[in-house]
Amino acid sequence: MKIGRLRVDPSLFEVRFAAGCDTRRCAAACCRGGVWLDTAERDRVVAHAELVQRVMDPGQPRDPRHWFSRRVVADADFPSGRAAHTRVRGGRCVFLDGARRCVLQKASLAAGNGLQLKPYFCTAFPITIDHGALMLDDEDYRDGQPCCGATRGGPLTVFDVCRKELRHVLGRLGLSRLRRMAVRNRRNRAPC
């Protein structure tokens, strides 16, 4: 099954979540190891360093040279084909403030002009793209999060919990197509 260039991983139809799961209450548990972002996103953040610095906590590093690792990797899942990683400080992404809020998101909101500094895959989490497959982030979500995670027999579907994130990745039409796939999948699995 495909939507555009993306293969749809069956986990999107099979994984269930616990009652009460809501990605808006996550307290940034997913940010603990930093994040991969397109090199163009990294460059945009550095170009707006002054805006980012204004919303940082006093203990966060102000020097943009300390925000990203120097290593750049080839990765076809990113628009430019190249990805960089945020640095990790104190066990979490360097852009996470003391209240566990993303300063890139805060800076974007402070700009008030539609500027998007928060990386694409941060906004999409727990949905990710891995080797051209649309899927749940294995490392973080399948093993469970302190705030919310996949569970056997849970009452909520990926669509219940991740609709906003799926729309971010697929767009409105892509989400509608994925929903139809899920309905067909449910019918095919229904006991006779």
Predicted regions and their residues:
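Short loop/turn segments that flank or connect secondary-structure elements
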Residues: 1-92, 96-192
